[in-house]
Curated annotation (Swiss-Prot):
PANTHER family reported in the protein's UniProt record: GLUCOSE-6-PHOSPHATE ISOMERASE
Organism listed in the record: Streptomyces avermitilis (strain ATCC 31267 / DSM 46492 / JCM 5070 / NBRC 14893 / NCIMB 12804 / NRRL 8165 / MA-4680)
InterPro entries, sorted: G6P_Isomerase, G6P_Isomerase_C, Phosphoglucose_isomerase_CS, SIS_dom_sf, SIS_PGI_1, SIS_PGI_2
Listed NCBIfam families: PRK00179.1
The protein, known as: Glucose-6-phosphate isomerase 2
Top-rank lineage group of the source organism: Bacteria
């Protein structure tokens, strides 16, 4: 997009048409929309894979959706989508292709980067992962003392941690329960301390996830883990090769650490960290759930990839969800988006989406380097129902902010629940459906009065409703369904970035903090005079050193 005012997003006729339409809909209530269209509840739904997506409780009409699709066409969302799938370098600031979709491509697919088909390499790594995972799961792989591995500790940060940690929790009912799997990411030593304190080092395998093998937090934790292992085993460096594997591309650094490069699993610079857990980064997950179920998850990703690539605009679910976010963020001044899964197993799902969405679209500069003049990525937040109902739903129901929300639920409880707990699933889902109805339709003053409520309390017990929600419903939670859900949100984020004309695949804000931390550390440890520290930070460093007795 050019900097010329005629082509700026907020100057486009499609944008101004939406702004005018927003004014025309002001005062329209979801109660009115449903009254005008009795078939709305069934008509405003889409299907993709195993996911049933109900968007009837959104503040939209057929005209709204048409105008949003016109905006997508004007900003060439599908053109950028096609360029991504072709392997073009759409990450403009790093001159990289964006091909997380290749990680789940079938063996016979052809996806080229710089003229080379990357799919054979993807499947070679998957096959290598599968072989290793089975060796661990069957007990064939043993530690330094000959004991089989019973504990897996994944050491990474960001995309090397959030994805596999989330997926392990989501698919816990599919895991080998004889294995203990833990995740360490924080450079705070307490994280590693708590992860290993009750583990037998002779039965523990560390999976070190760092593409460059230089990520400071990860290598610091990996070094401490190595020290713990060798001290506890009273062993020499030769023990490392039986208890550590690497997810990396830096063979030299991996070898220097003591890891056998035969146990190094590679990935590529055309995979961003927050899109990487279906690559080698998912090794700890594959060990936990097994290669077959890991591939089922990849199949789920692919279902939505193919849908996003081929479905027409009016039936394209990621496009719809992305455009609904544009509608609220840019035309209703919504600052955040809640994702509320009604499944305990999805307890880390929203935290994963925080990185996916906020690191991708937390940008204020266009792809051409010009500043944006419109709102971009929202704050993404939420926790599983029904816990959130007793915490922050009050603000969604009766607060002053418009907060669009996604409700994710499943018709069947997981298969291995104790029989006495299965009946609770209906209560969980009763809350699921009740909340979206309450948010949409609220409770009028007359309805409150009809219950005999004293007049002075009527305003307090009135709910205006008109809070938009998407309901995503699947029969059951499976590896495939998890893949479908993640791909759905990946492509939703892509759509929004394309409309906003930002690079959704870099993360320069992350890099700045890393650089500054390296400069500040000597001031903490040695009292060094660090050039460029502001007066506030200098005073805080001095206070820190005083409290540490330095």
């Amino acid at each position: 997009m050019n900097a010329d005012s005629r082509t700026r997003l907020n100057q486009r006729p499609e944008w101004t048409a939406l702004a005018k339409h927003r004014e025309e809909l002001a005062g329209t209530h979801l109660r009115d929309l449903f009254a005008a269209d009795p078939g709305r509840g069934a008509g405003y739904t889409l299907e993709v894979g195993d996911l049933h997506v109900d968007y009837s409780k959104h503040l939209v009409t057929d005209e709204t959706l048409r105008l949003l699709r016109e905006l997508a066409a004007a900003t060439d969302v599908f053109g950028l989508r096609d360029a991504m799938f072709r392997g073009e370098k759409i990450n403009v600031t790093e001159d990289r292709a964006v091909l997380h979709t290749a990680l789940r491509a079938p063996r016979d697919a052809v996806v080229e980067v710089d003229g080379e088909n990357v799919v054979p390499a993807v499947h070679a790594v998957l096959d290598k992962m599968s072989t290793f995972a089975e060796r661990v799961r069957t007990g064939e792989w043993t530690g330094h003392t000959g004991k089989p591995i019973k504990n897996i500790v994944n050491v990474g940060i960001g995309g090397s941690d959030l994805g596999p940690a989330m997926a392990y929790e989501v698919l816990r009912s599919f895991t080998d329960r004889s294995l203990t799997v833990r995740f360490v990411s924080n450079v705070d030593g307490a994280d590693l301390h708590e992860a290993v304190r009750d583990l037998d080092p002779a039965e523990t395998l560390f999976v070190i996830a760092s593409k460059t093998f230089t990520t400071i937090e990860t290598i610091t934790n990996a070094t401490s883990a190595r020290d713990w292992l060798l001290t506890e085993l009273k062993a020499g460096q030769e023990a490392v090769a039986k208890h550590f594997v690497a997810l990396s591309t830096n063979a030299e650094k991996v070898s220097e650490f003591g890891i056998d490069t035969a146990n190094m699993f590679e990935f590529w610079d055309w995979v961003g960290g927050r899109y990487s857990f279906d690559s080698a980064i998912g090794l700890s997950l594959m060990i936990a759930i097994g290669p077959e179920r890991f591939r089922e998850m990849l199949d789920g990703f692919r279902i939505v990839d193919e849908h996003f690539e081929s479905a027409p605009a009016e039936d394209n679910v990621p496009l719809l969800l992305g455009l609904l976010g544009i509608w609220y963020g840019n035309f209703h001044d919504a600052q955040s988006h809640a994702v509320l899964p009604y499944s305990h197993y999805l307890s880390k799902f929203t935290a994963y989406l925080q990185q996916l969405d906020m690191e991708s679209n937390g940008k204020s500069v266009q792809r051409d380097g010009n500043p944006v003049e419109w709102e971009t990525g929202p704050v993404v937040w939420g926790t599983p129902g029904t816990n959130g109902q007793h915490a922050y739903y009050q603000l969604i129901h009766q607060g002053t902010k418009l907060i669009p929300a996604d409700f994710i639920g499943f018709a069947e409880p997981v298969a291995d629940l104790l029989p006495g707990l299965v009946a609770q699933h209906d209560l969980l889902m009763a809350n699921f459906f009740a909340q979206t109805q309450a948010l949409a339709f609220g409770k009028t003053p007359d309805e409150v009065r009809a219950e005999g409520v004293p007049e002075q309390l009527v305003p307090h017990k009135t709910f205006k409703g008109n809070h938009p929600t998407t309901t995503i419903l699947a029969k059951e939670l499976t590896p495939s369904v998890l893949g479908q859900l993640i791909a759905l949100y990946e492509h939703k984020v892509f759509v929004q970035g394309a409309v906003w004309n930002i690079d959704s695949f870099d993360q320069w804000g992350v890099e700045l903090g890393k650089v500054l931390a390296k400069r500040v550390e000597p001031a903490l440890t040695e009292g060094a005079d660090v050039p460029g520290l502001d007066e506030s930070t200098k005073a805080l460093v001095a206070k820190y050193r005083q409290l540490r007795g330095r």
